[in-house]
């Protein structure tokens, strides 16, 4: 199979083919197939006969036409307006095994035809290997088809597995990674439902304060960290490093769920006119909006579902998040203020130790803490004081005692059952 060479050859009176003098088709006749078409001045019954002609039996290799894929896709010669708008293209995604063939031949043809590169960037992927990290082939019988995986784990989970593979490296089919992706998708659903539940008034109407209502240090710290994620994830996507973008976003998301949501959930349930409540709600809404958009390229279905609960239109038509979406004054560099960030760091650290104590004692996470004693430096104790109310509420702390000391420590005295 392939594109036939549009060439015929004369057959002399003795039946010998004269390869020295090819018969070429006029340009306005192209394309032609010499195995069925007849050269000018001959008839079909002269094929293979003395004094007649024969067609060239060879075909071009696959790269002869594959090397023109940017031009073919762009409507070259057929749609000049489209071609002017899309060529040169932005990106050629391809695997590493055809760099010297497809990539090289495409660049050469573009240079010869247009004097230009066919695209500005090339993203090199690896192969998808079987679960034993062997190259898949029909002869080996180790081909893994995607449909059963999509049906079992869902499209978002399969996309998560694919997006976890580093550019330029081979990636094995890994159902364990797909299960991780499914858990992430379910967590997005549940965490979003939890967060949006804190934004609803008594009749269920969502009330979202503006971002300038964010005043609590712990809320500002969370949004400050998110601003950094926005900058890093955006830079990764612009460099086609989707795995890095996912890694940074996912890491923040799990910390957001495990620490921040637990710390602010009580405050977010307060009266709407309370500044602390407004701060928590504005921060929750802002963070959720940004996180959904950051995750949308990898988890398109679950993010679209959550977006439809409280936003108009498709998330995939929404603007990509910027640091401005994380609050006023975030700045393009998205630098985190150390003093503000220490509030969230200290609160999360102390809450984690409280949880550990309850787990060790085999007590419910709702079990009250009679006395929580924290020993640390003045700066870290000041950071804890800025989030004291949230730590008390999240940990069920009755009494919080702080002590200055060079040797940090947390003592948890649980209330009697």
Give the ranges of each region predicted by the language model.
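Feature 926 captures the class I aminoacyl-tRNA synthetase adenylation module centered on the KMSKS loop
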Residues: 1-64, 68, 112-151, 155, ...
């Amino acid at each position: 199979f392939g594109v036939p060479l549009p060439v015929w050859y004369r057959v002399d009176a003795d039946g010998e083919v004269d390869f020295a003098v090819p018969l070429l088709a006029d340009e306005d006749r192209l394309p032609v197939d010499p195995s069925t078409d007849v050269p000018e001045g001959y008839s079909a019954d002269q094929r293979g006969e003395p004094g007649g002609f024969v067609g060239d039996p060879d075909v071009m290799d696959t790269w002869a036409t594959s090397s023109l894929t940017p031009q073919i896709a762009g409507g070259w010669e057929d749609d000049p307006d489209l071609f002017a708008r899309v060529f040169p293209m932005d990106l050629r995604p391809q695997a590493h095994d055809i760099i010297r063939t497809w990539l090289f031949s495409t660049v050469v043809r573009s240079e010869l035809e247009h004097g230009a590169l066919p695209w500005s960037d090339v993203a090199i992927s690896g192969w998808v290997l079987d679960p034993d990290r062997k190259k898949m082939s029909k002869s080996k019988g180790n081909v893994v088809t995607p449909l059963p995986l999509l049906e079992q784990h869902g499209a978002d989970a399969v996309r998560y597995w694919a997006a976890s593979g580093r550019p330029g490296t081979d990636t094995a089919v890994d159902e364990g990674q797909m299960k991780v992706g499914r858990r992430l998708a379910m967590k997005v659903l549940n965490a979003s439902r939890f967060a949006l539940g804190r934004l609803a008034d008594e009749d269920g109407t969502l009330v979202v304060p503006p971002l300038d209502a964010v005043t609590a240090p712990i809320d500002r710290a969370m949004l400050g960290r998110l601003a950094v994620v926005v900058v890093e994830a955006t830079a990764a996507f612009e460099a086609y490093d989707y795995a890095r973008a996912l890694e940074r976003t996912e890491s923040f998301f799990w910390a957001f769920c495990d620490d921040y949501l637990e710390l602010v959930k009580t405050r977010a349930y307060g009266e709407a006119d309370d500044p602390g409540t407004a701060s928590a709600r504005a921060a929750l809404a802002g963070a959720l909006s940004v996180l959904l958009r950051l995750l949308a390229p990898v988890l398109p279905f679950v993010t679209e579902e959550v977006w439809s609960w409280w936003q108009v239109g498709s998330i995939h038509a929404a603007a990509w998040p910027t640091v401005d979406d994380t609050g006023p004054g975030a700045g393009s560099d998205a630098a985190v203020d150390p003093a503000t960030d220490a509030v969230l760091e200290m609160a999360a650290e102390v809450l984690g130790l409280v949880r550990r104590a309850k787990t060790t004692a085999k007590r419910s996470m709702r079990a009250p803490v009679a006395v929580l004693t924290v020993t640390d430096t003045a700066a870290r104790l000041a950071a804890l004081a800025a989030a004291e109310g949230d730590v008390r509420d999240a940990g069920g702390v009755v009494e919080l005692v702080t002590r200055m000391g060079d040797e940090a420590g947390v003592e948890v005295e649980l209330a009697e059952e």
